[in-house]
Amino acid sequence: MLASGMLLENRLVERRSIIRLVEENFRDHFPSDQELPGLEFFPLGEDSWSYRCGPLWISVRRDLDGHFPGAYEVSLLLSESGKGYVLAPLPGRNGRVVHRIADFPVVVFPYVESATTPPAPPTQEQIDLLIARLGEVHAFEPPASRPVDVPTEDFRFPFENDLDKAVQAALNGDAAAGGPYAGLLAERVDRCQGFLAELREEATRVAGECAARWRGERPALTHGDPSLANVLFTKGVDIIDWGGAMWAPPERDWAALQRVFGTAPRSRPEFLRFYELRWHLAEIAEYATRFTGPHTGDADDDAMWERLTRYLPEPRGAS
């Protein structure tokens, strides 16, 4: 678990700023005569830096471009509608669910002990319960009195420009001075050009097919990444981290289940393939972008390079 997380604390967000946020918006979660406890940093999760402050779990999000506050707001509506398995964020005294520190989104949750321990593989019964609960989420309609701005699937690839820039920087040698993985990236991208081109061509074709078929269908409210990091398999099955919520075909969640657990409800193959391809290419774009910029070869870099090599494997016969 720790090997795949954000291992290093983000020093751009000062701890005193986080404590100030808690003091101003969440003081009522502590006894009035109690001094606020210090922050404890947890190296968990790839998309956030996480802290515990007594009964609170504080998530400083790093996904600035793909961040939609409405995704967290809709999880609060899900919880309030009786879906107790949705671990929703806590609204602050100012009424907001999403706060900002140093231009980073910050979301505060109740602290749950099981969210900080290494996950155990789920049983088939637990996976079946997860599927049933995701099905309930898919059918959810927010009340008209509380509209939320949740993005809708457009079958596009928002990372395409980043991927193009990273590939060109690697091939042109523009990133050679960025850090210890720049040269390795250039070699890997050069050998995998054909594989990457085929992957992108297939993704474009499948995206067009899915967009045409989905037109006119009722969208489902999807979580987007019901993985071991975001589902707590304890006595029940609780779903956390709703930052990627989106109106989309249900296969958006089923593809994630297939990728992580190797099983999913009966689904349309072309939609499953679209989400598989988009995930694959997004991972390549993210990690390639990291290694064409300044980096030091720290523990986070080591873990991300290992992941990149899984998504961009050496061609057969390469030496």
From Swiss-Prot:
Keywords: Antibiotic biosynthesis, Streptomycin biosynthesis. Gene3D superfamilies: 1.20.58.840, Phosphorylase Kinase, domain 1 (3.30.200.20), Transferase(Phosphotransferase) domain 1 (1.10.510.10). InterPro entries: Aminoglycoside_PTrfase (IPR002575), Kinase-like_dom_sf (IPR011009). The keyword Heme does not apply. Pathway: Antibiotic biosynthesis; streptomycin biosynthesis. GO terms for biological process: streptomycin biosynthetic process. It holds the Pfam family APH. The keyword Zinc does not apply. This is Protein StrN.
